[in-house]
Amino acid sequence: MKRSLHSKEVANLSDVIKIDKLPEKAIIPMRQHDGIACAPLVKKGAEVIVGQKLGECEGSDLAYVHSPFCGTVNSIELMPNPSGKRILSVVLTPSECAQTVDFVPEKDAPPSRLIEIIKEAGIVEYYEKPTYLALKPGKRIDTLLMNATFPLITHAYLSSLDKVLEGFKLMLEASGISRGVIVLRADDKESIKAFKNAKVDGKPLTVAPIVGMRHADYYLEDVEDQIIVVAAGKITYTPTMMNLLSANVMGRKLPLGYEPPDVHVVVCGVKSAKAVYDAINEGKPYLESAVTVTGAVNNPKTVIVKFGTPIKDVIEACGGYKGEPGKVIVNGSMGGVAVYTDEAPVVKNTVGIVVQTEAEVLRDEATVCIHCARCVDVCPMNLLPGRIAAMADMGMFDRCREYFALNCIECGECAVVCPAKRHLVQLIRYSKLQIMNQKNETVEATE
């Protein structure tokens, strides 16, 4: 771990800039969510404007795709996305034209219409689920959690905190959920101060710590507020850690194989709350969001990026690479994915880009498992990482499902302690991908 990034490199990222320089090309994947890919609505040579719908799909799990740029469609072809998959994408040559579609606000819409607006806007949660589906899981839900434990992303939206809070209220209204809990890191002093100074319906927000058995329910029983804020430890809850978020904040532990809606909880992000505000109050689809760029770049910072902008253009906006890059990782050095090309675009669930130098990249050679069970000892989800990885290595993905591979939060603890240097996280992630592919193929076959 000595060669991992130092915290001081990411500590001074209070500056948030919007990338105004147009990329030479924009790559807009027709699938930016966990579901069926959209079909392109445009053809090669077509002129598009900002906000125009580029992709539409049918089914129960969809997220429409819109153009963040004016420009010309260069091609429609398979292009790599940040996860390494080749996805059918609309490739644009952006132009300086500022023309947009007519954005129509619908501030007084009823709840059923609010859900439809969120759906039409193509808003996707940081864990890749379309927001309109997350808000209506088909189960009884009593609490909406906003995961604001990514400090640098949360800081990017503090200047528009009133809009984030209004968007969160609209999500509660659209879903019919009675109460909301905003979760901050306990050491994120800047965000805690901002939320303490914020008001909802003219009243200051209640900001309370999660201590011992005092979970969010403890405070919700004593206040009449619809929304409260809690400071919950020093953990950043990544997309794979929603079960831990529900357990640690609400005190509702989930058995293996279950998800937060099974204990009456739904999770959303800060970015989606702001996007919901933009969709309902300004009529705008989901076109851009905040991304944190850290590591071996000359000017680490948080930037507001339009979806479809290649990663290399984002890094150039941060001063370019510092030295020769060894690895570029999207969405965190532990649980993220290393991209094989910086031509891959920023997409709706991108929250961060980490650049490592060659000296920082660990390239240990994997050997045979010695069955020491250290991976079992450290797994926070009480899984058998070594066993799941072995099954994945043999292509036995049904067995991986039986061993609850989908419950892995990809924290990396097992890989860190493994004396055989097995690529446990990569193998388990591969098994999860194959399991989800089988699920999607089954869904497509039945529709």
UniProtKB/Swiss-Prot annotation:
Q: Which Pfam families match?
A: Complex1_51K, Fer4_10, RnfC_N, SLBB
4Fe-4S ferredoxin-type domain sequence ranges: 359-389, 399-430
Gene Ontology biological-process entries: electron transport chain
- GO cellular component annotations of the record: plasma membrane
Q: What happens when the gene is disrupted?
A: Deletion of the rnf operon abolishes growth on acetate and ferredoxin:heterodisulfide oxidoreductase-coupled Na(+) transport.
Assembly, per entry: The Rnf complex is probably composed of eight subunits, including RnfA, RnfB, RnfC, RnfD, RnfE and RnfG.
What family is this? Answer: Belongs to the 4Fe4S bacterial-type ferredoxin family. RnfC subfamily.
PANTHER family from the UniProt entry:
ION-TRANSLOCATING OXIDOREDUCTASE COMPLEX SUBUNIT C
Report what the protein is called.
Answer: Ion-translocating oxidoreductase complex subunit C
